[in-house]
Amino acid sequence: MSEIVAAALAAACGRHLGAAARIENLRRESGGASRQTWSFDAVAAGTRHELILRRDPPTVAGGEKASSTALDRATEFGVLRAAFQGGVRAPEPLFELTAGDGLGEAFVMRRIGGTAIARKLLRDAPYADARTRIAPQLGEIAARIHSVDVARVPSLARREAADQIAGLRATIDTLDQPQPVFELALGWLDRRKPAPAAQPVLVHGDYRTGNYLADESGVTAILD
């Protein structure tokens, strides 16, 4: 598998970097149940580019999405580009792969230093100072995410509170057994749902430890 990925990346990076590319240090990162993340270096014209490949796994590419709310790679690329250009602390998206590259829906972005491992961030001594900064940094980054112009990503679906409640209820109904606690919670939410927003904003659907990178200075990038 890695040889196939490396060959496809060499061709794609060569097109976008303007020179023949050599792929080094290719490895698949752990995590990401519904998406594959590959780390690699592309060396072209004497310059080393530290990059990340995001792709659908073969079982997902061309088939059903991993979940009803999952974004396709093209939309994810568009959201990431709009966020990066809007000043969000996020990896810079570089280019999308084509069908001819043979890797399914995929794109390449720059690699950012830091760790997403909660145990290290919460306990290890090198991150002691970072732990005092991460919470306010995440608040500032969340506000920046909310300021991104969603009109720049026309393929991004608008999901009102009522839509999300209905989606959760449909998911619970597939369990084919009573879920009284969830039904009570959804009923409470449904009775108190806000009116449709006049101006929608971009939100991160899974804003938590594990979906950001941090080093000794604090948050380096928001992921996913």
Regions found by a protein language model. Give the residues of each.
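Activation loop entry of protein kinases
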Residues: 203, 221-224
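Short secondary-structure junctions
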Residues: 20-28
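Juxta-kinase regulatory segment immediately upstream of eukaryotic protein kinase catalytic domains
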Residues: 1-21
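Catalytic-loop of the protein kinase fold
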Residues: 202-204, 209
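ATP-binding pocket architecture of kinase catalytic cores
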Residues: 27-161, 166-188, 192-199, 218
